[in-house]
């Protein structure tokens, strides 16, 4: 029992606050934007050039000032990413008292959630965590997964999503539907968008499933 429950969060419309303006804070901001967060505020006395660039582009909001205890109450997620341990501790305490989820970049176990290492391929998201015990191990496994699940999975996942929606409308038999989707998941990484339209693919999958069952 490691005490962590894995979950995927939908961040659209969710206020996220990052306290800190250095490289660690920048990584947190980029991770949030990659996950679709659209309400990100960064609070610090100064910022990395990349954070400033994102603010100029309207992707995030920056507040060039010191952290105030009331800041955490305005968020759903808070990231304590400063280079001051005592300030990070106070941010985590403020979040805990307000019932807000807080991530401490300097001491993961002292926050209420941690960030896994992530591989993204379109809508495919593969996450791995060592529960804070060894970030280096998580990173190594992430690199292995990145090699195993290459860029081809971006198109594969998109096609599987389209196929699933079509199958739900066209195949009434639940068992057949399940078998078709499982077979499609096996085939998709070896296919490309030029391999034909979705309806033809469905027909071929149904025929292959029928042959398996006879």
Locations of the language-model features?
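Residue-level detector of alpha-helix initiation sites
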Residues: 23-24, 86, 132
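Short loop/edge segments at beta-strand edges and connector loops
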Residues: 44, 62-66, 106
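Glycine-rich, highly charged phosphate/nucleotide-binding loops
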Residues: 53-73
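E1/E1-like adenylate-forming module used to activate ubiquitin-like modifiers
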Residues: 83, 104-154
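An accessory alpha-helical subdomain
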Residues: 132-214
């Amino acid at each position: 029992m490691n005490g962590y429950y894995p979950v995927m969060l939908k961040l659209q419309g969710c206020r996220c606050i990052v306290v800190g303006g250095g490289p660690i804070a920048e990584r947190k901001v980029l991770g949030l934007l990659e996950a679709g967060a659209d309400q990100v505020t960064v609070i610090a006395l100064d910022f990395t050039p990349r954070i400033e660039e994102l603010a100029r582009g309207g992707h995030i909001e920056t507040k060039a000032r010191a952290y105030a205890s009331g800041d955490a109450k305005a968020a759903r997620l808070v990231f304590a990413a400063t280079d001051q341990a005592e300030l990070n501790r106070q941010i985590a305490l403020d979040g805990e008292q307000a019932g807000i989820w807080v991530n401490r970049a300097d001491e993961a176990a002292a926050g209420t959630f941690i960030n896994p290492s992530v591989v993204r391929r379109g809508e495919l998201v593969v996450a791995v965590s060592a529960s804070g015990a060894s970030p280096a191990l998580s990173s190594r496994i992430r690199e292995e997964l990145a090699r195993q699940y290459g860029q081809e999975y971006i198109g594969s996942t998109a096609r599987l999503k389209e196929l699933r929606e079509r199958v739900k409308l066209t195949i009434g038999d639940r068992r057949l539907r399940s078998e078709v989707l499982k077979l499609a998941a096996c085939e998709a990484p070896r296919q490309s968008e030029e391999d034909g339209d979705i309806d033809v693919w469905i027909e071929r999958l149904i025929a292959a499933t029928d042959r398996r069952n006879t």
